[in-house]
Amino acid sequence: MTNFYKVFLAVFILVCCNISQAAVSFIGSTENDVGPSLGSYSRTHAMDNLPFVYDTRNKIGYQNANVWHISKGFCVGLDGKVDLPVVGSLDGQSIYGLTEEVGLLIWMGDTKYSRGTAMSGNSWENVFSGWCVGANTASTQGLSVRVTPVILKRNSSARYSVQKTSIGSIRMRPYNGSSAGSVQTTVNFSLNPFTLNDTVTSCRLLTPSAVNVSLAAISAGQLPSSGDEVVAGTTSLKLQCDAGVTVWATLTDATTPSNRSDILTLTGASTATGVGLRIYKNTDSTPLKFGPDSPVKGNENQWQLSTGTETSPSVRLYVKYVNTGEGINPGTVNGISTFTFSYQ
């Protein structure tokens, strides 16, 4: 009986010691630089086309296929996190702030740039779902970070300089029973300094900057009911534009800048009551609404004046009297509207 137990114990120890354990080791660097040092990039775009995604024509990024060595069935995925402040979004992807004028779009993921995940927010997120190496094989797990600058705001020098800046981190995520133990799991990234040389295109106004439209004299009987309209005057605006510029415009009520309706406020010099002014463009049947005095892309009540294929765009404007429904008292009618062009 004693000999039987000795044989059994010896076999058990032999089987135990041949069990394989999934393995991982860190072979990369904990601190990594993204992009070439002192990179310089040049682009041309319409002045107010902001935020402008600055295609640098080549990748600003970091790739390394050999960050962790894995073997014996080890399963690994990747998580990524950006530490820069979120200052906006573009098509659902966060724009991260570098300076007041320059931001970044960031992708993190596996070794191939094409598989990178568009980053949003400042929390850890899955950027590579993962895989498991074969039980009897060995391989490596890599990673990549890619960025694209975004111009957020114009400056007078048309030159934007960015200093070396910490971006965030990627960490290895073991799963399916795999464990990293004491192995380094997190690597950090910093963006190398770079310069953007920005050339902007725009338009020149050919029409005088101050246009006076003489309004025709009418009788109250021509506006019998609330909402009735009569053409009061007309004018045109003409511009000369660089190629590729799409012109947008915003009308602002100079007397009441907060006005967002389609009826222009009469100035204090007006003596008529119960009548307002509407402005139409070209052959439109809907009057233009008033918005803030701003060239910002997407400004409230901004409307398109031309396409990027027109280098000599123009617009015909019609001013119409409108019965506001408050009872018309004859008198003088004066209104002031400003135009703000946005070159996109």
From Swiss-Prot:
Gene Ontology biological process terms from the UniProt entry: adhesion of symbiont to host; cell adhesion involved in single-species biofilm formation
Record gene name: f17aG
Segments for region (Receptor-binding lectin domain): 23-199
Species per Swiss-Prot/TrEMBL record: Escherichia coli
Biased composition (Polar residues): 299-308
Residues making up the signal peptide according to the UniProt record: 1-22
Binding of a carbohydrate, residues: A65, N66, D110, T111, S139, T140, Q141, G142
Gene Ontology terms, MF aspect: carbohydrate binding
Subcellular location: Fimbrium
Keywords: Disulfide bond, Fimbrium, Lectin, Signal, Virulence
InterPro entries noted in UniProt: Adhesion_dom_fimbrial, Adhesion_dom_fimbrial_sf, Adhesion_dom_sf, Bact_Fimbrial_Adh_Pro, Fimbrial_adhesin_lectin_dom
GO cellular component: pilus
Role played: Essential fimbrial adhesion factor that mediates binding to N-acetylglucosamine-containing receptors in the host intestinal microvilli, leading to colonization of the intestinal tissue, and diarrhea or septicemia. Also confers adhesiveness to laminin and basement membranes.
SUPFAM superfamilies associated with the record: Bacterial adhesins
Residue pairs linked by disulfide bridges in the UniProt entry: C75-C132
Chief location: other
Protein's recorded name: F17a-G fimbrial adhesin
Pfam families to which the protein is assigned, alphabetical: Fim-adh_lectin, Fimbrial
